[in-house]
Amino acid sequence: MMNTASVKDGWVDSDGLRLHYVSWGRDDAPAVVMLHGLRSYAHTWEPVADALVDRYRVVALDQRGRGLSDWDPQRDYYAAAYVRDLDALVRALDLRRFVLVGHSMGGANAFVYAAAQPERLTGLGIEDMGPGASAGSQGSERIKRELKETPGAFASWDDARAFWRRQRPNITESALDSRIAHSLKEAGSGRIVWRHDADGIAAARLDATPAQLVHLWPLILNLHVPTLLLRGGESDFLSADVAAEMTAANAGIERIDIHGATHYVHDDQPAAFNRALRTWLDRLDDPTWRVGG
């Protein structure tokens, strides 16, 4: 298990919101910044950090409305706002060069950031995200159904655990434990409620206008950062065909399919995910990043 002395919590302000982040490892190690998915949280990356922390600094942000970060009263849960938050984090930590990794929504945000500030990035890691996945895939329709059908509270922790297990039948028991611990909390009434802004996030996802959606193809075609695409071999979100089109469109994208994983690759097959990411990180050639900061 990870040495808990290497784990630190921090806070950063963005758009008047107080946002929480977690940092694992030495401050002077090469930085890897990680962005979670739609209804996730910073600590989802803890097993990944455990696999990297001997050589890298891993920083994970509770994106606005999730984890311990403030909810946005304006419900601005869209890419432009998330990228402002990421920029605030990067500047607060004075990260001159870093690798950016994102899952699903976090992957879309990572693509947007890479297009805006490529000079800061040594590499880009994308977990199961690509063009059209959020709008036209079977997985996107599944997620919309989940958002509509998710209860606002549970009578007990057992009920909450059973709900998450039905929603994520493939994730490991340790990943399920993490979801219970970090996505839920006990209210004063004794009911179990969500830590994240479930209603606001659902409204933003279900009612997004075309202008609020991220169109990834232009970003991918103009991407000039070494990129690792980690796709779930059983994903209903990012199809094998779209992943193939991404690598064909940009020679800088390296693709690895993780067998036995759905859209939630790092939760379903953590050992394979961590091994693939670590191998790729160890190969990146950027002396400025290697010296830390």
Question: Which positions does each model-derived feature cover?
Answer:
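Flexible "cap/lid" loop of the alpha/beta hydrolase fold
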Residues: 111-115, 122-157
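Catalytic histidine-centered segment of alpha/beta-hydrolase-like enzymes
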Residues: 261-270, 274
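Conserved acidic catalytic loop of the alpha/beta-hydrolase fold
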Residues: 81-98
